Structures are given as C-alpha cells and as structure tokens.
Design a protein with these regions (language model features):
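Structured, solvent-exposed acidic/aromatic patches
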Residues: 17-18, 56-111, 115-288
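Membrane-proximal, proline-rich intrinsically disordered regions
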Residues: 1-55, 82
C-alpha cells in the first residue's frame, strides 16, 4: 500500500550499496566539516586556531574566544554535540543493514575511528565501545580502552579493505559515495594506516610498547601509509562555497596566524605565497 511503483525497494538499495553508501556520505563530514557553521566552530576556531594556522578577529557575545582560552560557555560542547550524531546516526543504520559485515561496514568503522579520535583530542575519555544507539546514557571508555578498541576496529577494517584491493574485487558500487578519494580504495587503506600511525604517536608516551607495535605495523603494511601529496585526503563536501573562504572573505572573521607565517617565512617555504596574500599595508610582506 502507498508504495511508489517506480521507486527502488529497500532490497534494491541494499543490492547496489545505495542505502549504506548514502549513509557513508553522511558520516564523512565528521572528519572535515563542510557546512559553513560547523566548519567555523570546529575545524577553524578549534583545529586551525590552536594549530597555529589562522586566528579569529571577530568577537562574539561576551567577547570570549578560543585564542584567549575563554570561549563562550555554550561552545565547549560543540565538537562532541555536533560530531557524535554525525558518526552514529549513519553508523548504526549501516551496521543493521549490513549485519556488521562487508566493506561498507568496515568503511564506516574507519570513519568512526577517525572522527572519534578528533573528539577524544578535545575531551579525553569519550563513549565508544558501549554505545548502542538505544540508551540515553552510556559509559565512557577510559583513554587506554578507547585506543585499544579503536586500534582493534581499525585493524579489522584495514584487513578487509586490503584483502579486497589486493584481490582486485569490484568495489565500483561504492565509488559514487566516496567524497574523498573518488572510489580509490587503495588510498583509503593508506588513510587508515596513516590514521593508525597517528594514533600510535598520540600514545607514545603513555603506552610506548603498544605505540611502537602499531606504528611499525602501519609503516610495514603491504599498501602502507601516505607518502606523497597525491595520497592526501580532501573532502569535496561543502554547502556551496569553501567554508574557509566564506569565513575569511564573505564574513571577514579570520586572518592568517603569525605562527604559520613565521615558520614558513623562516624556512623560505614556497607554500607561503600560495597560502597567504601579501599585506596591503605597512610595506606589504606576509604578516600574521
């Protein structure tokens, strides 16, 4: 009853990965926010600000800001409150549709681990292994358990993707949902191994033996880690305009940081002239 005779059925969508693929697309922004407000609040005002790439020049509300270590109270939860639904709304549906099997599910695991590490970088311990999607409250994983669980999930995903890539399996039905590498799943293996290496570096002081093991596994892997600029991950998702361009030029709310201009200028790095425009005042030059 009340069924479109010309539309696809749920069975049709499962067969060509349309249902799981569309959910994968919804998870990718958790790694790099393309929507303008989410990008500004998370990637720019937290990641790029504290990473020494940009600084905010606008003031909001009480005049607080991340660069003064005094953001508005309501901003403290932004990374958690925005990213967790982006991960798990799609993840649990993919797990249900795939019964926790197949490449789409393992792809979702890679995205889940990458996004969870971003959240943990901000807050420390977070819910991970105990999340069910049906409970109002969830126990947090300790930092030790969190990283062990993320390593386990990532290792399983790497093994599944690597087996398929090396066997030359047809993964074309997933290509159209890939906003990062356009269906080049060898690059997704490199991404996952590089993520594994980054995680190992994160825990190198707290768990040096585990860090050494995981770092060596990532580098020694048959497909390996990112080693060339062509391996770089770039999300093509946005809401009509590059959000960094929008905030810098349409909204006039950010400028380049003195940190990055000092380092790039000090080392005569050729990327400086690509990243930064010459100052229009005080004799020009690259001024952060």
């Amino acid at each position: 009853y009340n069924t479109n005779p010309y539309g696809p059925t749920q069975e049709d969508m499962i067969g060509d990965n349309a249902s799981t693929g569309s959910l994968i697309r919804s998870m990718i922004p958790a790694l790099a926010q393309g929507q303008q407000n989410n990008s500004q609040m998370l990637d720019q005002m937290i990641g790029s600000e504290f990473g020494g790439q940009i600084t905010c020049i606008a003031t909001w509300g009480n005049g607080g800001n991340y660069y003064t270590y005094n953001p508005r109270i309501g901003w403290y939860g932004n990374m958690f409150d925005t990213t967790m639904p982006q991960i798990y709304t799609g993840f649990f549906q993919i797990r249900k549709l795939s019964e926790g099997k197949g490449l789409a599910y393992q792809w979702a695991q890679i995205l889940r681990v990458a996004a969870s590490m971003r959240i943990s970088d901000c807050y420390g311990a977070i819910p991970y292994s105990q999340i069910t999607g049906s409970a109002f409250t969830t126990a947090y994983d300790s930092m030790e358990d969190l990283y062990k669980n993320m390593f386990n999930d990532l290792d399983a995903a790497i093994a599944a993707f690597e087996t398929a890539v090396l066997a030359g399996d047809d993964m074309s039905s997933l290509k159209e949902y890939d906003l990062v590498f356009d269906g080049d799943f060898r690059k997704w293996v490199k991404f996952a191994n590089t993520l594994k290496l980054r995680m190992a570096i994160r825990i190198s002081n707290a768990a040096p033996e585990l860090a050494k093991q995981k770092a060596e596994e990532a580098v020694a892997d048959v497909i390996g880690v990112m080693t060339d600029a062509s391996d770089a991950a770039y999300s093509s998702y946005n809401d009509g305009m590059n959000p960094y361009y929008r905030v810098a030029y349409a909204w006039n709310e950010i400028r380049v940081s003195a940190n990055i201009t000092s380092y790039l200028g000090g080392y005569n790095d050729p990327r400086l002239s690509v990243y930064v425009d010459n100052a229009s005042l005080d004799g020009g030059g690259y001024v952060g």
